[in-house]
Amino acid sequence: MAGKNVEKRDNQTLCCSFCGKSQKEVKKLIAGPTVYICDECIGLCNDIIAEEIDREETKDTKLRIPRPSEIKAVLDEYVIGQERAKKTLSVAVHNHYKRIESKVAMEDVELQKSNILLLGPTGSGKTLLAQTLARILNVPFTIADATCLTEAGYVGEDVENIIVNLLQAADHDIERAQRGIVYIDEIDKIARKSENPSITRDVSGEGVQQALLKLIEGTVANVPPKGGRKHPQQEFLQVDTTNILFICGGAFGGLDQVIERRMGGRSLGFGADVQSKKQRSLTELLKHVEPEDLLKFGMIPEFIGRLPIITALEELDEAALINILNQPKNALTKQYRKLFELDGVTLKFTDGALKAIANEAIRRKAGARGLRSILESAMLDVMYEIPSRKTAREVLISEEVILKKSEPVVLHAQPEKEAAEPKKESA
């Protein structure tokens, strides 16, 4: 009888006790007392256990707060120049997370959050600074575009969607999200249209500033789990923004004129006016920004008060842009050299080529952000051809390639025709 039972069992199609898949649908089926489990379910169990362990470790591990000098040292690896801005950010971020991690009861002193406002022209490194800070601290990070935000109830993105995006960056871990960093770009674009309050509704300007106030200062935001608009039947996640660091950035075009008027730059006399403009560059003027200047620009007083740390980034000159091309860990020339190296080709740039790239970026007023598009345009053809040129060993990018769209010099191990002849004979 026992033998017959075994034979009957062998003839049966066995199935996984967890997912129900048959032994024919999976790679392995492991038998236990009265149960079976397939390789797919084992893999899923391993993933669940690993995720739980990681989450517990994240909760138990106290955030290590780097010293300001350590933060700046890492910023130096990715951001060229902007020394004062990097020092200011390093101190502000260190103090912010020290405030969060402090377990000492401070009944007599309340440490307030210090959000940051970055002023500077396009391509000066505002976004890169914020991204690098988040990487140093290993905290969730998200970027929001202020021009897409509108007041609640109007077409556009609600300000709460910023927190939804941060929550997604934290893999929906609310505790991690509540220690994250939010960078709001183009903040100058939500300035109200005039210095005086208007009776008409400004849903994408002053209205957005008002909506951002509580979020930046610290509030418990009710956010929909999957983003989008709120509706009454929906369940909400509660996220406390008290310990989220908000960094706002913008070019603030025209703010220099406001500062210059306050400082008496437009003094009487034609000659005095010209002299003041020569002496005071945009960078120099932005260094002297005061809250009253931002008020005249169109930011509301309450919003300015939520961003106590204001730092200006410098305009990037030719030397700075050349250094950006060469020095950082993620320098563009290093990236392109690595791409060519994967095809067995050495890529070289002449000094004239680097100067031409930097000057073209200055001419376009694109700053460091414009460097990649200039390089891509100049090198498109050679990047298209090199993978097909098996004998190519070296590519030289000269000034003429950038300015006159000339062909780069390509050196071969042997003439291409000679390399192709043996193939013809063998054929």
From Swiss-Prot:
Family matches, as Gene3D superfamilies: 1.10.8.60, ClpX chaperone, C4-type zinc finger domain, P-loop containing nucleotide triphosphate hydrolases
Any one of the GO CC terms: HslUV protease complex
Molecular functions (GO terms): ATP binding; ATP hydrolysis activity; ATP-dependent protein folding chaperone; protein dimerization activity; unfolded protein binding; zinc ion binding
GO biological process annotation, one example: cell division
Binding residues annotated for ATP, in chain numbering: P121, T122, G123, S124, G125, K126, T127, L128
Domain ClpX-type ZB span(s) in chain numbering: 3-57
Annotated positions binding Zn(2+): C16, C19, C38, C41
Keywords: ATP-binding, Chaperone, Metal-binding, Nucleotide-binding, Zinc
Top-level lineage group: Bacteria
SUPFAM superfamilies referenced in this protein's UniProt entry, alphabetically: Glucocorticoid receptor-like (DNA-binding domain), P-loop containing nucleoside triphosphate hydrolases
Pfam families: AAA_2, ClpB_D2-small, zf-C4_ClpX
Subunit record text: Component of the ClpX-ClpP complex. Forms a hexameric ring that, in the presence of ATP, binds to fourteen ClpP subunits assembled into a disk-like structure with a central cavity, resembling the structure of eukaryotic proteasomes.
Alphabetized HAMAP family for the sequence: ClpX
Family as reported in the entry's similarity comment: Belongs to the ClpX chaperone family.
Function: ATP-dependent specificity component of the Clp protease. It directs the protease to specific substrates. Can perform chaperone functions in the absence of ClpP.
Name of the featured protein: ATP-dependent Clp protease ATP-binding subunit ClpX
